[in-house]
């Protein structure tokens, strides 16, 4: 049996921290949302995501929800509606782990494309998505509320039909 490098062992172990979101998680999810965003989603939006059957996931660190991801699957397309990591846990690879999970789950569900919108000002998220082989498709003008009015969203997409995906290590 081949020995895995310590960094890979740690990454594989951390995947176990991802599980499906339940309604019991919504209080913690809202706490993460409010800590991370100036214009957070409401509790009702998260309830609706669970109710309509979107693919909703949380990442736990020592039994506390510190991140989550929500994907709408529709035929051959997966749309990441929200991917958020609590500010105290950002820049630790949790966002990448969740993105990997959402991508793999979308592929396994039959999607051949995964897309998302990101605030033009969210440089850290843009770097994550571009490093994960997402490509810019366009701009949604005035998509997000902003303290000065509205902010544009960059539309990013990634093909899931390739045999080799460096983000997933395959």
Q: Which residues are covered by each model-predicted region?
A:
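Conserved catalytic-core motifs of GNAT/GCN5-like acyltransferases
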Residues: 2-4, 117, 130, 135-155
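Acetyl-CoA-dependent GNAT
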Residues: 2-5, 9-90, 96-109, 142, ...
């Amino acid at each position: 049996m081949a020995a895995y490098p310590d960094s890979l062992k740690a990454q594989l172990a951390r995947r176990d921290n991802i599980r499906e979101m339940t309604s019991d998680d919504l209080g913690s999810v809202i706490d993460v949302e409010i800590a991370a965003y100036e214009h957070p989603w409401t509790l009702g939006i998260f309830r609706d995501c669970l109710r309509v059957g979107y693919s909703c996931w949380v990442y736990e660190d020592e039994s506390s929800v510190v991140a989550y991801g929500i994907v709408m699957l529709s035929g051959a397309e997966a749309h990441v509606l929200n991917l958020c990591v609590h500010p105290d846990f950002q820049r630790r690879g949790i966002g990448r782990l969740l993105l990997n999970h959402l991508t793999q789950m979308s592929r396994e569900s039959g999607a051949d494309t995964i897309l998302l919108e990101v605030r033009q000002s969210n440089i850290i998220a843009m770097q994550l998505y571009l490093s994960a082989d997402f490509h810019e498709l366009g701009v949604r003008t005035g998509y997000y509320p902003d303290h000065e009015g509205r902010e544009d969203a960059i539309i990013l997409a990634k093909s899931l039909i390739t045999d080799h995906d460096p983000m997933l290590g395959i």
